[in-house]
């Protein structure tokens, strides 16, 4: 994750702002600079290479002292920065909005995936600039639309029916901020269209998940799509979701946290997010992840979770 101010800076033109991507030499200069505490939140002028990000964001970049940041000297960093600028420049951002826009925290990996989709000549985003910009605006929180299959970050499609598409995420192969844990495996499920879904399509998805992905929990971060994650990583996801939710609501911003379809979501996660929305503490909410919750009556007749050991999926082993 990183703030948009880590990728670009605003330049006032008439009554609105144009956004310009940083170059990596300017960032490198900022990372070596000694800056007064009172100037930590200001864009840094490298003199030679142009404007650089505010020094307060130093930890967002990979250095010899910090291996967890972005690999800003890669070609991919420039591709993502340009993509963000193209999307922001399609809007009219005024002085009253610019600080809020640049402080927004976005998923670096999501944006790299969109950059990869843009370069794939078989992908619809390669052929449609309008759809590409729409996808980026959704990714950076400048659109209220949800991420559907056409505007999704992408990955490897492992399941699809008339209503849903399931993607295996490819973060291990990334340049900008790769996942270093070689055991990482995670999926995302997007809606093909943001409209009511038939019970038949839901049943098909639930059957696929219970049969092929029974070692995973189906959760949501509240943004209109599902995530399919290892049970061992659920607590980590819970911490992140709770922190994000509290941070947004603390600042007085309304958040439409979408609980999604209870028939698909892991029931303990549904209980966790419902409790979170009611205003309970993290400890109270997280206890629900580890409690045995009484199984709801199976909404799909004939669909069982009972499997013999030789029938259990080996995905995720």
Curated annotation (Swiss-Prot):
Family from the record: Belongs to the rotavirus NSP2 family.
Role description: Participates in replication and packaging of the viral genome. Plays a crucial role, together with NSP5, in the formation of virus factories (viroplasms), which are large inclusions in the host cytoplasm where replication intermediates are assembled and viral RNA replication takes place. Displays ssRNA binding, NTPase, RNA triphosphatase (RTPase) and ATP-independent helix-unwinding activities. The unwinding activity may prepare and organize plus-strand RNAs for packaging and replication by removing interfering secondary structures.
Compartmental location: Host cytoplasm
Protein name: Non-structural protein 2
Record EC number: 3.6.4.-
The UniProt record lists the keyword Transport: no
Keywords: ATP-binding, Host cytoplasm, Hydrolase, Magnesium, Metal-binding, Nucleotide-binding, RNA-binding
Active site (UniProt): 225
Assembly notes: Homooctamer. Interacts with VP1; this interaction is weak. Interacts with NSP5; this interaction leads to up-regulation of NSP5 phosphorylation and formation of viral factories. Interacts with host DCP1A, DCP1B, DDX6, EDC4 and EIF2S1/eIF2-alpha; these interactions are probably part of the sequestration of some host SGs and PBs proteins in viral factories.
Region (RNA-binding): 205-241
Cellular compartments per GO CC: host cell cytoplasm
